[in-house]
UniProtKB/Swiss-Prot annotation:
Keywords: Lyase, Pyridoxal phosphate, Schiff base. It comes from the Bacteria. In the presence of PdxT, forms a dodecamer of heterodimers. InterPro entries: Aldolase_TIM, PdxS/SNZ, PdxS/SNZ_N, RibuloseP-bd_barrel. Pathway: Cofactor biosynthesis; pyridoxal 5'-phosphate biosynthesis. It comes from Natranaerobius thermophilus (strain ATCC BAA-1301 / DSM 18059 / JW/NM-WN-LF). This is Pyridoxal 5'-phosphate synthase subunit PdxS. D-glyceraldehyde 3-phosphate binds at residue 166. Catalyzes the formation of pyridoxal 5'-phosphate from ribose 5-phosphate (RBP), glyceraldehyde 3-phosphate (G3P) and ammonia. The ammonia is provided by the PdxT subunit. Can also use ribulose 5-phosphate and dihydroxyacetone phosphate as substrates, resulting from enzyme-catalyzed isomerization of RBP and G3P, respectively. The active site is at 82 (schiff-base intermediate with d-ribose 5-phosphate).
Length: 295
């Protein structure tokens, strides 16, 4: 059977291949090699990790293509890169570079406060963040092949990622329990495409894989998110802002694979050195919360 490259089936299938794995933010080829050796299923190529983006302020944009190309040349695993929300030209540049996935990301400063990228027009698959079922299904309707919780990136605090995965799962359970004649009203209420609401009811899950992201900093955090229903884990600042990145990277991979084995979790949580310095999300002003970007 000949399946055309870039079809919805192919793009979603590529994302399915990452299930159960860890995707790590990297800023150099050396970091990318550490991530690959630790067992990461993919890396996210950036100029700065979210903690540094948050600390630096200003406008955060797509990484320099030269940075991305060097990381792509350094590893054999898939390489992702971020584009600003609504910035379809950045996305086209990333597609031209040959990245394996594009993250239309709230970690970068949005280019458009009203419209997200029409991801159906691209050959490359997209990943997007969501805080609830409606937001997730809107992104899938636009062509996202993979979802992740938004969490609160760059904080080292998993509380918002927990809130978002629980909210999505609660939304799915609600839809499953609705009679068919109430699905259209629910689609209207949460701003989601009706056909995707029907699919959620039938399948009992999102139409695409849903990873945890935003504040995952320890093996225990990764295991927690997996037990709450995530299909895999993104780790941003939590690895290379820690005391022993190589050991922590391996430990988070092991914890994600063995998320319900407490013997393994106790072992991989031991002797990791200092974790990244965290931020209490409650201390952030509303305008400092990256999760509020997009709709």
């Amino acid at each position: 059977m000949n399946i055309e490259k870039g079809t919805e089936t192919v793009k979603k299938g590529m994302a399915q291949m990452q299930k159960g794995g860890v995707i790590m933010d990297v800023t150099t080829p050396e970091q990318a090699k550490i991530a690959e050796k630790a067992g990461a299923v993919a890396v996210m190529a950036l100029e700065k990790v979210p903690a540094d983006i948050r600390a630096g302020g200003g406008v955060a944009r797509m990484a320099d293509p030269e940075v991305i190309k060097k990381i792509m040349d350094a590893v054999s695993i898939p390489v992702m890169a971020k584009a600003r929300i609504g910035h379809f030209v950045e996305a086209r540049i990333l597609e031209n570079l040959g990245v394996d996935y594009i993250d239309e990301s709230e970690v970068l400063t949005p280019a458009d406060e009203y419209y997200h990228i029409d991801k159906n027009k691209f050959t490359v698959p997209f990943v997007c963040g969501a805080r609830n079922l409606g937001e997730a299904l809107r992104r899938v309707g636009e062509g996202a092949s993979m979802m992740r919780t938004k969490g609160e990136a760059g904080t080292g605090n998993v509380v918002e990622a927990v809130r978002h995965i629980r909210t999505v799962m609660d939304g799915i359970r609600k839809v499953q329990n609705l009679p068919d004649d109430e699905l259209m009203t629910e689609a209207k209420n949460i701003g989601a495409p009706y056909d995707l609401i029907k699919q959620v009811k039938e399948e009992g899950r999102l139409p695409v894989v849903n990873f945890a992201a935003g504040g995952v900093a320890t093996p225990a955090d990764a295991a927690l998110m997996m037990q709450l229903g995530a299909d895999g884990v993104f780790v941003g600042s939590g690895i290379f802002k820690s005391g022993d990145p190589e050991k922590r990277a391996k430990s988070i991979v092991e914890a994600t694979l063995n998320y319900d084995n407490y013997d393994v979790l106790a072992d991989v949580s031991s002797g990791l050195g200092e974790a990244m310095v965290g931020i209490n999300v409650s201390d952030l002003e509303e305008q400092e919360r990256m999760q509020n970007r997009g709709w």
